């Protein structure tokens, strides 16, 4: 196994899978960042702040636990779903997921994923916005989907890469950003930090 090249400040199995798909060796660093939208923030500002907060929290945590200053970059990311200027994050319970999926049903929405790569010296953030269209969903489909367990840890209460993919009629943008990590943009940023 090759040497670790960067840290991932995320517990998301999908982000771990996608970073592995890019061929990077990484270590996970667990960070605790409060995800609370400020009234003055746009959706774009909010998701970018969260990815920056996660990456910089990772940098601080690594520096606090290592004897030498960490030189490896830390990658933080966050994904939100936006419909009618309403931000949809992870559902709290079935009623919340039902509300979200009913909002998305038969309509277009946006998935915003922000990725930040940071070190002590610098940071870079990139936002990728993808338009997604849903078919009209029945209450039975929503309930059955919730019972699958899939929507419970996903922004907007669905996963494009799983059962939720059957609700999607069209997509414009990055499929991988909807999953949680845009591959092209992430790869360019990481290569830039690693001088590859």
UniProtKB/Swiss-Prot annotation:
The active site is at residue 78. Keywords: Cytoplasm, Hydrolase, Nucleotide metabolism. GO terms for molecular function: dTTP diphosphatase activity; UTP diphosphatase activity. The record marks 14, 79, 161 as: Important for substrate specificity. GO terms for biological process: nucleotide metabolic process. Disulfide bonds: none annotated. It is an enzyme of class 3 (hydrolase). This is dTTP/UTP pyrophosphatase. It comes from Photobacterium profundum (strain SS9).
């Amino acid at each position: 196994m090759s040497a670790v090249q960067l840290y991932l400040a995320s517990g998301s199995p999908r982000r771990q899978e996608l970073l592995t798909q890019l061929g990077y060796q990484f270590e996970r660093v667990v960070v605790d960042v409060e995800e609370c939208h400020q009234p003055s923030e746009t959706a774009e500002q909010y998701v970018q702040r969260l990815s920056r907060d996660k990456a910089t929290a990772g940098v601080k945590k690594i520096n606090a636990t290592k004897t030498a200053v960490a030189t490896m970059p830390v990658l933080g990311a966050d994904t939100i779903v936006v419909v009618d200027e309403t931000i949809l994050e992870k559902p709290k319970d079935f009623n919340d997921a039902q509300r979200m999926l009913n909002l998305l049903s038969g309509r277009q929405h946006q998935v915003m994923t922000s990725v930040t790569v940071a070190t002590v010296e610098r940071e870079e953030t990139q936002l990728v916005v993808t338009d997604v269209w849903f078919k009209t969903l029945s209450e039975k489909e929503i309930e059955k989907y919730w019972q699958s367990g899939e929507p419970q840890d996903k922004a907007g209460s669905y996963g494009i890469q799983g059962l939720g993919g059957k609700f999607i009629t069209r997509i414009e943008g990055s499929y991988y950003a909807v999953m949680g990590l845009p591959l092209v943009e992430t790869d360019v940023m990481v290569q830039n930090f690693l001088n590859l």
